[in-house]
UniProtKB/Swiss-Prot annotation:
A GO MF term: DNA ligase (NAD+) activity
UniProt similarity note: Belongs to the NAD-dependent DNA ligase family. LigA subfamily.
Cofactor(s) for this UniProt protein: Mg(2+); Mn(2+)
Species assigned in the record: Xanthobacter autotrophicus (strain ATCC BAA-1158 / Py2)
GO cellular component assignments: cytosol
Keyword set, alphabetical order: DNA damage, DNA repair, DNA replication, Ligase, Magnesium, Manganese, Metal-binding, NAD, Zinc
Superkingdom, taxonomy of origin: Bacteria
Single GO BP term: DNA replication
Keyword Metal-binding: yes
Name this protein carries in UniProt: DNA ligase
Function in brief: DNA ligase that catalyzes the formation of phosphodiester linkages between 5'-phosphoryl and 3'-hydroxyl groups in double-stranded DNA using NAD as a coenzyme and as the energy source for the reaction. It is essential for DNA replication and repair of damaged DNA.
Amino acid sequence: MTAPKSTAPASTAATFRAIPVDDLSPAEAASEHKALAQEITGHDAAYYREDAPVVSDAEYDALRHRYEAIEERFPGLRGEDSLSEKVGAAPSEKFGKVAHKVPMLSLANCFSDEEVVEFVARVKRFLNLGPDDEVAFTCEPKIDGLSCSLHYENGRLTVAATRGDGSQGEDVTQNVRTIADIPERLAGKGVPQTIDVRGEVYMAKADFEALNARQAAAEEKVFANPRNAAAGSLRQLDSSITASRPLKFFAYAWGEASDLPAETQFGVVEAFARWGFTTNPLMVVAKDAAGLIAHYRSIEAQRALLGYDIDGVVYKVNSLELQRRLGFVSRSPRWAIAHKFPAEQATTVLEDIEIQVGRTGALTPVAKLTPVTVGGVVVSSATLHNEDEIARKDVRIGDTVVVQRAGDVIPQVVRVIEEKRPAGSKPYEFPTHCPACGSHAVREVDTKSGKVDAVRRCTGGLICPAQMVERLRHFVSRNAFDIEGLGEKQVRAFYEWGLIASPADIFTLETRNARSLQRLENRDGWGKTSAANLFAAIAERRTVAVDRFVFALGIRHVGETNAKRLMRHYGTVEALEAGALAAVIPGEEHPKGNEAWQEMIGIDGIGDVVAEAVIEFFGEPRNREVVTALLKEVTPEPMEQVAAASPVSGKTVVFTGSLEKMTRDEAKAMAERLGAKVAGSVSAKTNLVVAGPGAGSKLEKAQALGVQVITEDEWFELVG
């Protein structure tokens, strides 16, 4: 199964992700990718191990969809531990573990007729078949239960296991033996010597209602839905409890098998029925996408009358030979897909539109709703995506709206019921100032393409409380002010204690602490020595390289490299600020091209996007106040000038392996001071590779490309 039905009125999955994946910066993508991984892992554990899911099927699918879309857009985030390569959750320690010789994979999902047509076309393309060539598919209901694998040796049930993480499941053999639908011995012809029969343990709706009535009468826990009841019943340590629960089983797949009784999916499932299993009577064979969709509609129409929960229809290539040719991709087979039913919708009143400010300054509109139940979950908030979506749908406060829990971001406002709009309502005006700090909020424009960013962002990064902890954490980070002993944990605590609210506060902390009634050394986790060490570390950073100073300000799009480029040109923070202010055109939200603007974009490597971000930053008066206050406490050191006559000036250099005479940061600084560009990877554009002991793939690639390779000693000889 892919996801649970919710048992809670709210969940972390309702965190609204309104920024389209294509608009995420690499840093934003990495941060969200990590957060999504943690969230999905938690939901997997709740669903597969604890039988206590807290998000709906649609919510979970949307989280997975977002996670995979980020990996597709930013392939570098897909590591060996990516959730894209995993299924389910690790088995519980309460049960013995069973290894699946053939992994129990999940299925890819689709939600529209167009996606079904594309699935069929994709299968044919992979098989080098023409559009008119015929491929048969099976169609069957997608049961909302708990996946289980039953291992038979010489026709006898020997081991039963849950899906677990797909590679290893929980041993539930004794509990499975109590389910009447699961034969202890396989009867009939064609039973192989060994076979794993796979299917779904579920509970019929009538049995679920009767069980809950008994539970309530005995003043015991009642279950939220049939799926939870089935999973909780199967995963009992006492098999007598499982025996008392009305569990059922549909057989529909297999894993390891010494032989198979047929060459088609449908034929093998027919054999399951002959051997004593219950199979789904609604399974049919279709020969094209139109047939698949027609059967989907038929099952959807019968859904309420089936007597058990389903959440879609599964399509599988019928020929086992074609299945073998198609193979697998990531965590699912190419030859199968689950066509999910649309999420349920409900109508309610939009009471207000709240603007939330994210840690990067993004303004996200959230609809505050009269609470309404959608698919068994109480919804009181929904995303409105961004101001363009609000305008496109003409969403207004007081409107009656349709809310849905499905799609890219959920829950969401689908549409307005205009005939119920109250008299005198006015179009919503999206704020142009941050509700958290009052700073100007802007939408970036690519001056070359004219494309306007969908997201409006606060420009008051250094004074905005919604962004402050993240901004302060960045300010003290290693490549910025690099203050030892002042990490994210300490920054967050100091901010919550009211000790630090802006960068300049860091440098007045010791003075203020001496006058405070509650000194730092008397707070939990601190003492005289640790406080003294922190104050000493802060004092050491009262002088800092000017490019580090600018990088530490956290100006959007200004990383270490761009900070260096800007400060090599402007020299001082004051000159950079003056240049930015000179480029501001009164009454215009975006620069149009005066001399100051042309000067900034004329800097090598500084384009329109970076220049506009710098101008917007210094265009906010309170940002300038913060910078002025900081300059009273800190002295930025001028950048060392590039050596124009250096033998490596203008060349791209890569350092690899262990450096023995300098750190990697020192090597980078030296090379840049000599006018070189330092890259992190080797390419055809690389001019020189400096290789120390232990150099690996970068050295090999350099040799393959014919790039000059030298040792660390030869580097010092070269640059003098």
